[in-house]
Amino acid sequence: MAKKKKKQKRQVTKAIVHIHTTFNNTIVNVTDTQGNTIAWASGGTVGFKGTRKSTPYAAQLAAQKAMKEAKEHGVQEVEIWVKGPGAGRESAVRAVFASGVKVTAIRDVTPIPHNGCRPPARRRV
């Protein structure tokens, strides 16, 4: 059987950190400026299950894991794009700041409908 070639790590200096927060989970995706994924993590990949994935602490750990992996690819400067209404927004952004990379911008790219689809009915408990 032929030897497998080891995949070479791409060296990227500028990146975009996409933080997607929902009511159930937080996904942190680090991409280059073209949108190709360099590293990613979520509440589930850092070891949480169920409702604990939606906590700010899970979002913090996910951001730390993704940034650690991104730094191995040579990322030094990032732009943060935050999307969604979840609980992990603030803590994920703080974790990116604490990782030691230079943050150039923070953008909120949460999609807002201009009277699009009908939203789900409110819960009656």
Swiss-Prot record:
Coiled coil: none annotated. The keyword RNA-binding applies. GO terms for cellular component: cytosolic small ribosomal subunit. One of its GO terms (molecular function) is rRNA binding. GO terms for biological process: translation. It comes from the Bacteria. Keywords: Ribonucleoprotein, Ribosomal protein, RNA-binding, rRNA-binding. The keyword rRNA-binding applies. InterPro entries: Ribosomal_uS11, Ribosomal_uS11_bac-type, Ribosomal_uS11_CS, Ribosomal_uS11_sf. Located on the platform of the 30S subunit, it bridges several disparate RNA helices of the 16S rRNA. Forms part of the Shine-Dalgarno cleft in the 70S ribosome. Belongs to the universal ribosomal protein uS11 family. This is Small ribosomal subunit protein uS11. It comes from Aquifex aeolicus (strain VF5). The lineage of its organism: Bacteria, Pseudomonadati, Aquificota, Aquificia, Aquificales.
